[in-house]
Amino acid sequence: MITKKNLAIFEINECDFKYFLKGATKYQFPLIKNYFKKKNKITTFTIDKEEGLNLDPWVQWVTVHTGIRSSRHKIYRLGQKLNNRTKQIWDIISLKGFSTTLWGLFNSNLRKKKNIDLFFPDPWSFTQKVYPQEFNDYLYLPKYYATNYPNIKLSKIIYFSYKFLKKVIFSKSFFYILKNFFSFIKIFSLAGLKSFNLYFFLDLISLEILCKNIEKKKSDFLIVALNSFAHYQHNFWDDDRFEFIYFWYLNEMIKKINYLEGYYNSTIFYNGFEQKKIKKKYFLRAKNPKRFLKILGLNFKRIEPNMTTGAQVFFDNDKDKSKCINFLKSIYLLDVPLFDVQKFKKNIFFKFNIYLYKKDFNIENLTLLNKNKYFNYLKKNNAKGLIYNNHSMLKKIFDNVILMKSTSEHTPKGTLYFKNIKLNKKQIENTKIFSKITNHFSL
């Protein structure tokens, strides 16, 4: 019998619960519907409204984990480090003497290791390390793929896949893959190595690893973050060919979550905030951000790509930093810059602003001869056009970018399912979740 105060939280980033339940009926996965029927539900909201600035997961999850709004914690980019004065939920709970496991949380920081059983950073983190180190081989593959997509080197993928699979094979998790071998064959025959399929697979195996780990040592406090459903909705929500795969993985993950919840009296299943389906559009992304800036003649120390259209760039000196800022800001769309550039003390962040509503226009071969045609095309599709008088530089830019599809946008509201934890109101701001969780371990 479970007697000690405990809590398991599953942060399924930006998932759409209505879509979950609709698909569960359509594809006959009753386990999914039954899982949510057994739980209480509240809605959450954030006062942040601007996608690309503060209405993003690497911002909102920091708000949830610290209990303070983004205007105070000022974390707006993947890989940014929270100041040490701001306490995270696990900082407080571990100090109370409760053992803790953290897996894949956006912009999470491990400060003290006392009462931390396992810390597995999100794959976009460039500063946080796995603890204990025996879990390192699980991180190399998702980290390389996440921070280098779409410019993936086959040799690197093979090497990191070998390290990952070797670790899985010599663990009990391999038996799960063997048991479901033919199901995986079917899924990969349908979707191949498309990014969403790999993210789903890695999230599912992460849960399987945690199931085996909890059998050996159960933490009092468990937080697991999964991003694969958000990735699918952002990039493939318009493609019905792969919808079954989404719900097959969801059903398998619910099985694992059910198993993990069996070790806990209290549970939370939360999406942070939701996405809404939109008319698909395409945005620009550098094929390789590091090479992209070098081709433009810019000097820098290192670069940390994010999961969308930009990257953080660090410099050896202020001269190189200023040159980069001035150059990127000098390139304009009809009425706004091609790049959004933000300046920080030690680095800058840049991203593309342009988007299109059709992919059939060959933007990569843009020349002066078709400039007017291009403007008319963009205006017709409610997009923005490019003005730049250095034509050779323009060609360099468009030769080194690709068009990425987007099929959803963020909304400021979320849904939280829970069991055996005090959440009395029907709606709360996401900043209030912090105190509800810390108070749970005080009662």
Listing of model-derived features with the role each one plays in the protein:
Residues 1-3, 76-82, 86-91, 96, ...:
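Membrane-interface soluble catalytic domains
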Residues 9-11, 44, 99-105, 221-225, ...:
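A structural signal for short, well-ordered beta-strand segments and their strand-loop junctions
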Residues 260, 264-316:
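Acidic/histidine-rich catalytic neighborhood
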